[in-house]
């Protein structure tokens, strides 16, 4: 393997194969909470101007504001309201957002960097576990599962989203 041996070793040690989960709860969440417009409610002229949203290769609807959509999606994933192994990618040239929930994808963790160009983990004052790194360090229900959708109230009780964002995940999984 020559010069790529370090890269191969890193990928072998840090990579993770996703287990996957059903796309149906995510599609329901996208239509109800993310304002993804269903195709049957849109006219052809509207579809031409909007961004297409695909989940596991299926066109499930369209949106108007892809920046707000992807930022909100990632924030909800960082506070575990969307499973951590869900990937999102915005293809600007084709005006398509791809979301994947299927199993068998090779992914690897990356650190989030805050606005001061420091890793987000420097904001933590306590010891971190792997679950804290990928799901945030907010207190969750006892039988928390990273591949299940939870409502904010069921997972965290009455806490406000702004409070949850302070202790959000500092690692993200990206597809390799």
Task: Please place each PLM-identified region on the residue numbering.
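Conduit-forming functional cores of very large proteins
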Residues: 1-176
């Amino acid at each position: 393997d020559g010069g790529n041996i370090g890269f191969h070793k890193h990928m072998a040690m840090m990579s993770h194969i996703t287990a996957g989960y059903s796309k149906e709860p995510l599609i329901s969440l996208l239509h109800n909470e993310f304002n993804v417009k269903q195709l049957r409610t849109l006219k052809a002229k509207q579809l031409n101007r909007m961004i297409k949203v695909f989940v596991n290769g299926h066109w499930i609807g369209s949106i108007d504001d892809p920046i707000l959509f992807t930022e909100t999606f990632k924030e909800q994933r960082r506070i575990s309201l969307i499973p951590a192994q869900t990937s999102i990618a915005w293809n600007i040239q084709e005006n398509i957002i791809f979301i994947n929930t299927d199993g068998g994808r090779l992914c690897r963790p990356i650190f989030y960097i805050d606005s001061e160009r420091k890793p987000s983990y420097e904001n933590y004052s306590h010891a971190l576990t792997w679950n804290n790194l990928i799901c945030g360090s907010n207190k969750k229900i006892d039988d928390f599962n990273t591949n299940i959708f939870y409502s904010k109230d069921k997972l965290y009780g009455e806490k406000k989203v702004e409070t949850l964002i302070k202790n959000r995940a500092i690692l993200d999984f990206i597809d390799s």
